[in-house]
From Swiss-Prot:
This is Protein fmp52, mitochondrial. It comes from the Eukaryota. The gene is fmp52. One of its GO terms (cellular component) is mitochondrial outer membrane. InterPro entries: Epimerase_deHydtase, NAD(P)-bd_dom_sf. PANTHER family: OXIDOREDUCTASE HTATIP2 (PTHR14097:SF7). It is found in: Mitochondrion outer membrane.
Length: 234
């Protein structure tokens, strides 16, 4: 049985991750750390889910460090937008800074497996700001030296976001139509949020058990086809 800590539990992918964790019998306990109370918390058994809610993100690392028992898996689906942060510079400070700070706190606490929801275009050498930020987050958490690091790189994430992203919404609409015609028309470039979530949980549990593909013992990167494989319903 695994104990899991999760940040980003109120986002599109993170909310599905929380639901998947709560439904999975291999998960003994889930701790979420967030700015808002996750929607799944109302119906979740208190014996399995503990929530820590604070707008003051400077308190998050200390909360993670204090968890007992220590989470064996730490999952980050945390992210923000340029608009919500008030510009890319602030977005970088929040998204990169908090992800790395929380990963370091998890490592120092003794967490064995780190799971990150990244992006298909993540590349620290990219000339574009967003994929470069995602790539730098990946590089910085890899450098922390977890026993096992799992990185998911989804394409366009299909689903319903709470915040408005008009251009992305149009692409999600196209992905939805394509998926209804044939899943193969969508799966290569877009994945549903619930599929990504199940892939994150399943990959995290496999990594904890050491059941990873050859060559992925320390670092396991899942692209779109891997996400579909590990996130499909049984």
């Amino acid at each position: 049985m695994a104990n899991v800590a999760l940040i980003g539990a109120t986002g599109m992918v993170g909310s599905h991750i929380l639901t998947s964790l709560l439904e999975n019998p291999a998960i003994a306990r889930v701790d979420t750390i967030s700015r808002r109370t996750p929607s799944a918390a109302a119906a979740a058994p208190q014996t399995k889910l503990t929530t820590f809610v604070s707008d003051d993100t400077s308190r998050w690392a200390a909360q993670l460090s204090s968890l007992t028992p220590t989470p064996s898996i730490f999952i980050s689906a945390f992210g923000t937008t340029r608009a919500a942060a008030g510009g890319f510079e602030n977005q970088y400070k929040v998204e990169h800074g908090l992800n790395v700070e929380m990963a370091r706190a998890a490592r120092d606490a003794g967490t064995k497996v780190y799971v990150l929801i990244s992006s298909g275009g993540a590349n620290k050498a990219s000339s574009f700001a967003y994929p470069r930020m995602k790539g730098e987050i990946e590089e910085d958490v890899k450098a922390l030296g977890f026993e096992r690091t799992v990185i998911l790189r989804p394409g366009l994430i299909s689903g319903q976001r709470q915040e408005s992203r008009p251009a992305e919404a149009a692409l999600r609409f196209i992905a939805g139509i394509a998926g209804k015609v044939h899943s193969g028309l969508k799966d290569g470039w877009a994945q549903d949020a619930d599929v990504i979530a199940r892939a994150a949980v399943n990959a995290g549990l496999k990594a904890l058990d050491g059941d990873v593909p050859p060559g992925s013992e320390k670092l396991w990167i899942l692209g779109g086809s891997d996400i579909i494989k590990y996130g499909g319903k049984k």
